[in-house]
Amino acid sequence: MKKILCPTDFSGTATKAVKFASEIAQQAGAHLTLIHVVHLPIVDTSETALVASELLGEQMRDASDKLKQLCSQLEETYGANRESNFTCDFVLKEALLTDVTEHLTKHEGYDLIVMGTTGCDSTMEELLIGSNTEAVIEEVNCPVLSVPGTAEWQGVNKIIYATDYAPGDKEALEKVVELGSVFGADIDVVHVVKEASPEAAAKAESFWLELQQKYTGVPLHFQEIVSKRADEGLKDYFKRENGSILAVLRKEKGFLQNLFSQSLAEKMTYQAEVPLLVLQGHK
């Protein structure tokens, strides 16, 4: 892992994401790039266009000052007097966030995006942050770690990967193992079934044997759990096992509306309770 992106609007939620991104970058010896975007409002007269242009210029200058200060603080905190290659820069654009992140991940070789997301009792501004996170996940071909505004950094000790035995699971697990190795974290591969059966047990055993053969020496564990609802089963397992990050595979557009169930999509985005790492399947 060499390069990490982290969008910020300087809100409390974004600050949490910057904390997570900085800790991961410091531990991995990676470069961190902060992103901030501004939008020129739609105008219908030359007079309002002039006012809007002046406002945009003011916003850009203010954001640039904040980004410079934040990068300086992060380099002082995470780069100074540590055995780390941590460095930080920023991108400031008048553009849509999805356009900027898609371009950077496609052309600049970024390995991970870290973004803030919010809970169901959020303000409208905070809900827009959650909406941006979902939009970025849908557009980029890069892992995205969404960090709830309520999350506190406690290291990465255990990553829980939710599998449904999709063809892309094994490739996605490579990214999970890569992140886990940075922290020496355990990785639990978890499959949820509504009820136990010999067929399910046989499929689970076959899948687990494949993983054991591929990931020798990796602290990888497999667990099949029984729950009528996948979202509740995963959440309970995550809490019981003191998970640090829940990882899932995005297989198609709109996956956040179809991931296991509608309720899981809701709980893991706008009502997020845990850091969620979304791995991208083939587009």
Predicted regions and their residues:
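Small/aliphatic-rich secondary-structure junction motif
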Residues: 1-54, 158-224, 240-243, 271, ...
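A short helix-to-beta-strand connector/capping loop
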Residues: 78-89, 215-221
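N-terminal Rossmann-like dinucleotide/flavin-binding domain of flavoprotein oxidoreductases
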Residues: 63-81
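Gly/Ser-rich helix-loop-strand patches that form or flank binding pockets
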Residues: 99-152, 240-283
